Amino acid sequence: MKPLLLTIALFSLAIAPPARAAESGVRLFMTGNSFHMKTVPALAEVIAAAGIEGHTLVGTMLLGGSRAITLWEKPDDANPAKAALKSGKVDVLTLCPWRQIPDPGVDEFVALALASNPNVRVTIQELWMAFDSPNAANPDVRKDVAEAEKAPTPWDEATGEKLNAIHADYFAALEKQITAINKRNGKPVLLCVPTGHAAIALREQIRLGKAPGIRRQAELFSDRLGHPGAVLVQLNAYCHFAVIYRQSPVGVLAPKTLGGIADADRAPLARLLQQLAWDAVKAHPLSGLGSSQ
């Protein structure tokens, strides 16, 4: 897939209609690592603000540093995700594997979910590279992490063009696995939540001085590894909302707090995050709303 940065970063200020509540909510089970954990409460707040009725969080299975296969291999008696899927009472399952793709656990979870609910949808969160390094996607990530931790991550040196190059191999590998799984099942059961692309677009807006209340790209991250701060968590929540409920988050009431963002900047920044999330979801061909769907 061609880089989406230009499509998203040239984001238009044309007024999009506010998000409209779906007829009914979905039964959601969320799994993932530390790049997904804080999205659980943030997404719940977005869903409530959008007026979705009947949404149910069936459960969560969250483990720092985990791949999907890490969670899959947990014993059945300590695996709430498997138990929930086997019950057939899950409409949407979220996955957020670490960056080593393909991840065989994704295939396993999709197969189990479909076996109990043929109408299930599974989402996979697109990530951003740790330390802004393409090497973060390599299997031998521990050596790369050890080297990278010796110095601060130069978040603010990145341009959109550079970030697209850093993420190119990872994005391509993720899309290849999604496409293969969907082809094998004869339908788009696995959907990409393109937070990685949306994050690149947001960082470009910050670099250009167009993100209310944020002066530096480094403000998006809570550490050198790249764990998300409040703003990036909120962007991820909007991306998930758009894919799960297949509607725009633009116009949803801004959160009451957004990290250290000043009150005067909170609503304009939330609006930017909503638009970038929606642009990314619409542009991605594997989101369920993209051009190839």
Predicted stretch roles:
Residues P17-A21:
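Sec/Tat signal peptide C-region and signal peptidase I cleavage site
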Residues V26-T31, F35-N119, S133-N135, A283:
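Conserved SGNH/GDSL esterase-like catalytic core that processes O-acyl groups on lipids
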Residues L5-A14:
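Bacterial N-terminal signal peptides
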Residues K82-V233, A242-I244, G251:
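Alpha-helical cap/lid subdomain in secreted, periplasmic
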Residues A22-E23, N236:
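Boundary of Sec targeting at the N-terminus
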Residues L208-Q293:
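Conserved catalytic region of serine esterases and O-acyltransferases that act on ester linkages
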